Amino acid sequence: MPSFDIVSEITLYEIRNAVENANRVLSTRYDFRGVEATIELNEKAETIKVTTESDFQLEQLIEILISSCVKRDIQHNSLDIPADSEHSGKLYSKEIKLKQGIETDMAKKIIKLIKDAKLKVQTQIQGEQVRVSGKSRDDLQATIQLVKNAELGQPFQFNNFRD
């Protein structure tokens, strides 16, 4: 019985490259000259800390980070950007979390989406991934297209294809 897994993974070396590119762009930007501004990656906690002197510059810094992520083929919705910023002394900061794995609520949304489409496949949650199996490859390909076209707020990859 053919099957595949739906996962949500980010390659950390691509994130590291995106953060380094954003820091390079930051060092050449005229509007950030003489301003204390940093973009730091914490790989163990899977977070990116963005710090600068004003709220407006913080938003500009996040735009720089998002554009460098997009250039590295990292979708911007894989970054969980908080709405409000932390303010301490003269610095504003945001701690951006990286979305890794599929949480149970999101997995249930994916399964409901597939069930509502009435495709002849079986789904099951396995930790931080969703296993989809069916009798026909065509049904599996239709499921992949359905999940790709759905706006669920998180990027998904499809791997572990088995025949």
From Swiss-Prot:
Chain's role: Nucleotide-binding protein.
Coiled-coil region list: none
GO cellular component: cytosol
Listed Gene3D superfamilies: 3.30.70.860, YajQ-like, domain 2 (3.30.70.990)
Name under which the protein is recorded: Nucleotide-binding protein HSM_1099
InterPro entries: DUF520, UPF0234-like_C, UPF0234_N, YajQ-like_sf
Keywords: Nucleotide-binding
Pfam families: DUF520
GO molecular function: nucleotide binding
Organism: Histophilus somni (strain 2336)
Superkingdom of origin: Bacteria
Entry's family note: Belongs to the YajQ family.
